[in-house]
């Protein structure tokens, strides 16, 4: 498994979680849709599935971890940035094999690619505070 395969899995997971958040569709249906309708060449499919399923099943727990560091209600946070923060929080909490610097850097890069103009600063701020609290 190459790092680029995980990066592609994260990119696809952001898009899938964004879709799930907005549509309210069953996560299994969202997963199936993305795996059949998107280009998944070079994607770590197992990691994509873990991120998608993990964020969906642990959403409440992840949101409880995130909420203290957000200055507005979570439902007012940009859905792309919320998806990115949820993925990174999942990695920071449940994937101890992923160094926290990697999880944060990947989230920042995803926010630069998909988020609002200063979305990466928002994402970085939340994740830095989350890591500092959990050290």
Swiss-Prot record:
Gene that produces this protein: nusB
GO biological process: DNA-templated transcription termination; transcription antitermination
Protein name: Transcription antitermination protein NusB
Keyword rRNA-binding in record: no
GO terms, molecular function: RNA binding
GO CC term, one of those recorded: cytosol
Species assigned in the record: Shewanella pealeana (strain ATCC 700345 / ANG-SQ1)
Similarity comment text for this entry: Belongs to the NusB family.
Record's keyword terms, sorted: RNA-binding, Transcription, Transcription antitermination, Transcription regulation
Its biological purpose: Involved in transcription antitermination. Required for transcription of ribosomal RNA (rRNA) genes. Binds specifically to the boxA antiterminator sequence of the ribosomal RNA (rrn) operons.
NCBIfam families in alphabetical order: nusB
Signal peptide: none
